[in-house]
Amino acid sequence: MNKKILFLGVGGIGVSALAIAAKRLGAHVAGYDSVANKLTAKLEALGIVIFTSPNGVDVANFDIVVYSSAILSSHPLLSQARSLGIQCLQRAMFLSVLMKDFSYSIAITGTHGKTTTSSVLATLLCQLDKYSSFIVGGVVKYADSNIQVNGTDKLVIEADESDASFLFLSPQVVIITNIDLDHMATYNNSYQTLLENFTDFVSKESVKSIYLCVDDQGCRDLLAKYNQSDKNVTSYGFSIDADVQIYDYHIIDEITHFKIRYKGDDLSFKLQLPGRYNVQNATACIIACLDLGFKYEDIRNALIKVTGVARRFDLYTKVISGHQVTVIDDYGHHPVEVANSISAVRDRYPNKKIIHVFQPHRYTRNRDLIKDWPKALSLADQLILLPTYSADEQIIKGAESQDIVKGLSGYLLADGFDHAIYFLEKLANENTVILIQGAGDVTNLVEILSE
């Protein structure tokens, strides 16, 4: 990749990964972000020049400008690049360009679990094939990074459906974890439009193999809608009609055990990640690796080393009011993700009381899923509900935190982190496990607990 590329919004995890990948593939790279952070410091340590002011950036010196969704079209650097006729590419559009440098790419998409599934497959392939690479939307714990370029053989990517940008991508393999109602403004609040976009994605000429979880109704709807016979379509899940069925799921000493029935063979696996949903995610990756020709024993040995992705069921032990308490930090922010996480906590800690500290994320999500929240938020033994993290949205009347628990009783409404800690100090002991959850800044509560 012999190009000079300027990355705008390079302090974000997605664009920073592309900048690193481009540099390792031979491009001359520079970046801009209005605020320096740990990611920009990492880029500078790799020899990438970082600008924090538009002043001094010679846009005319670049062949391509790549920008994140956080960069407005009116941004002076982007406007200048366009006026100069420089090629300007949104993040996913540039990823599609980058993919051409690799001989084989696998895209993971879906409403929930795509980052975790991407991290599982990335961890497996980096052990099974030293020339495999990945670019995903979270920090893969195995590599302590969201990006690794080891060669140009196989590339694992996370394909984002939230803004329909996955339609820019042309992979050879697609894994779909599920199709659910979220980010529906992208799809004009139409489930059929959402399905049509997924259909368009898997119908691309480049796609040869598709893996779908048939435990999910959205994936079943896609299968019913999809009628092309020129691709290898494999369904997986606990369902008895799955092409690859999962069974014998159980936990021993906090290790997840399960089996799959693959082409007539019964194969057993162990996984450090908790919950049925992570078994589903792992199964998709296992099948993809088996179909690529990797040996069962090698996959089995690699899978037990998978530790997932940062902020997905991260485990800590904290001293709270003199008690040693297990605390889990999790990114889940949709009713389905909340329900899955609480189920996983129950499976792993069947004899402990679950205290769920939840920070809703976006008023629009509260509003759009208002009927689904009460059931999901009733599943723990005790709910502590924080104010909604706005993500720069305006408050929507009838869609605040107290509105998503209408009909529930016994929950505690905290007005902030200090108030939540006050409740935790009263409630927590060795017989409790605390699940701190949300996509906003609630992860900071984990750090505060240790102070």
Curated annotation (Swiss-Prot):
It holds the Pfam family Mur_ligase. Its main location: cytoplasm. One of its GO terms (molecular function) is ATP binding. It is found in: Cytoplasm. Gene3D superfamilies: Mur ligase, C-terminal domain (3.90.190.20), Mur-like, catalytic domain (3.40.1190.10), NAD(P)-binding Rossmann-like Domain (3.40.50.720). Pathway: Cell wall biogenesis; peptidoglycan biosynthesis. Keywords: ATP-binding, Cell cycle, Cell division, Cell shape, Cell wall biogenesis/degradation, Cytoplasm, Ligase, Nucleotide-binding, Peptidoglycan synthesis. Its EC number is 6.3.2.8. GO terms for cellular component: cytoplasm. It catalyses: UDP-N-acetyl-alpha-D-muramate + L-alanine + ATP = UDP-N-acetyl-alpha-D-muramoyl-L-alanine + ADP + phosphate + H(+). It comes from the Bacteria. The keyword Cell inner membrane does not apply. ATP binds at G110, T111, H112, G113, K114, T115, T116. One of its GO terms (biological process) is cell wall organization. PANTHER family: UDP-N-ACETYLMURAMATE--L-ALANINE LIGASE, UDP-N-ACETYLMURAMATE--L-ALANINE LIGASE-RELATED. Cell wall formation. Belongs to the MurCDEF family. This is UDP-N-acetylmuramate--L-alanine ligase. The gene is murC.
